[in-house]
Amino acid sequence: VKASKESVTGLYKRREDRPERPKKRGLIPFFIPHLGCPQICSFCNQHRIAKEEALDSRTSQELPSSLPSAQDVKATIEEYIGSGRTDKFWEVAFYGGSFSAIPRAWQEAVLAPAYEALLEGKIDGIRCSTRPDALALEDIDFLLEYGVTTVEIGVQSMDNQILQMANRGHNRQDVIDAVGRLKEKGMTIGLQIMPGLAGETWTSLVETAVAIKDLQPDFVRIYPVLVIENTDLADAYRAGDYQALTLDQAVAYGAFLKDYWEAAGIEVIRTGLQATRELDQGRGLVAGPYHPSFGELVENKRWRDRIQSLMDDVLAHLLVNQQNGLGYPLQNGLEEPLEIHVSYPLTMSSQIKGLKSANAVYFESTYPNFNWSWKGDGTRVTIRVGKLIFVL
């Protein structure tokens, strides 16, 4: 089943005509192994797991056993959505394996049943992930013919030297060109970034952040590099040629990137890999900043930084007024310590106070002469310092 050019390619002639991303989403994921990747990236172990099928079967027109059959796709969709539709925006997602780089016959085999479900109203969208150098105009048109309207690109970095060291096989300009072509077709664009690759510096990370901001994708995912067993990066790590990010470094990088991109109107939909039983148990993980609640740690850091910035301003205010003889007390040597009340929606408790109250512990120990209270009793985040009230 194919869509007409008018029904799909012309869905949204201008990107601003697209409806807003729905808040409630339901993804129906299918993982495509290392079938379309022409490169063996330094951080990826799929080539050693998939072995000959991944590397040799691209010349075959037979559907490899690692791809879902049409019946598998149909059954999985039914399993997710159940007997009746909900208010969720259901989207089939083909992840991994550089989807648009696998043979067209294979793409068609898995896209056709998904597109049929789209036409029947069972699902609301189809997306895939791929490489920037596998998105020529003909590749994009083919995806559109089968109802794909969201494409996620594995960018990883916008520094050519870092991309070369990671053996990505594409460069910065490939990313810029691919995003431009997708925008011409009115598609929704997601970019995946991997802080912590070999050769990265703070300067190169900031330059990547600026380059991504200039591209104005619809959303971004942030995946700090993990050193996985059976990868070139693991070999380099054991040889002392690569140093993995610490958890604190990765959290700080994630907080910076999320703050920067969200300020530019770019949605960051994920920070950190999805927790799995294997990663939680440390199986296959050699080194790197893995945490099952990494995204929550990033939010903790962002709120800690905001509160810290406020405290810096408050202390400066108290100091100036004391120097001007207005009698405002400083933090130290208070006869009656200032009360600091942090109020927030109850649903934001773990973000504001931090996991295991880490933020509360930090501020109470850093400013012991203030009386701190933390309560999930507000409709927004406010901080009352004495008689002063600040809205964050």
Where are these regions (language model features)?
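Short glycine-enriched loops at secondary-structure junctions
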Residues: P33-C37, Y223-I228, Q274
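Auxiliary Fe-S-binding modules of radical SAM enzymes
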Residues: K2-G26, Y242-L392
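A general structural motif
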Residues: R25-L27, D87-E91, I123-G125, V148, ...
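A generic secondary-structure signal
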Residues: A75-S83, P113-A117, F142, R181, ...
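Conserved non-cysteine loop/helix-boundary elements of the Radical SAM core domain that shape
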Residues: I49-K74, G96-V251
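Generic secondary-structure signature for well-ordered alpha-helical cores
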Residues: Q46, E78, G82, E184, ...
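Short acidic/His/Gly/Ser-rich catalytic and metal-binding motifs that mark active-site loops
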Residues: Q39-C41, I228-A234, L279-Q281
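N-terminal pre-triad scaffold of radical SAM enzymes
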Residues: S7-K51, K74, E78-S100, S129-R131, ...
